[in-house]
Amino acid sequence: MFKKPDVNSYFYFTYGQIHKPALLGIFGAVLGYAGYNQMDKKSVYPEYYDKLQNIKVSIVPNAANGYFSKKMTYFNNSTGFASHEQGGNLIVKEQWLEEPSWDIYVLIDNKEAEKIAEFISERKSVYLPYLGKNDHTADITNVTLEEGTVQSRAAKIQCLFIRDKAEIDKDSVMFLYETELFKYEEALPIGLKPETNQYLLTKMVYTNMNLVNIKDEVWRAGNRDIVFY
């Protein structure tokens, strides 16, 4: 569950995908970097984000058309702070993703990225990584190191990408009538604002349609063409 900040006391909603700040939090836990609770007043960012914000990632949803099913889960919050009175009980509805799975790529182009590759390849972790909250443990499997190559030309991006960095090739869509086309789009966090540490959002897209005017470098990794951000 990757909780959206725009919630009330009774409903907690999730983003539809893991996002870059959440990924950096996982990597920070693996490497043992401090989080929000350890920040001092002089710090602009928590230690994990300060050290890892320049890491480049690529995210591929392992879901039909990019969409994971969501379900509402109910639980009791019996703290006095939550229910506004000692001994009170507040029933909270929380939205979860069902069986989420992603292929995550990290561009190894600096020392912190090299540390991430070393720790994850050797299955080392200082703290337990989790998906959004600590009762959803992150299961990191099938770790490989791959040689990637930058493509001089590409017609598709097979991962989430920033919407403003490419355009749907509308001319090609009419010739793909035998293919089930899809387009997933959502405003997702890509960073933190230095003034408040709140999420910096941008529109992200995942599609099997052909693209034009691709502004990012497209990497071939295995059998996929992906971009990093």
Residue ranges and their predicted role:
Residues 62-229:
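Internal, well-folded beta-alpha domain core
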Residues 1-5:
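Short N-terminal binding/cap micro-motifs at the start of the first secondary-structure element
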Residues 6-74:
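Glycine/small-residue-rich interface belts in oligomeric ring/scaffold proteins
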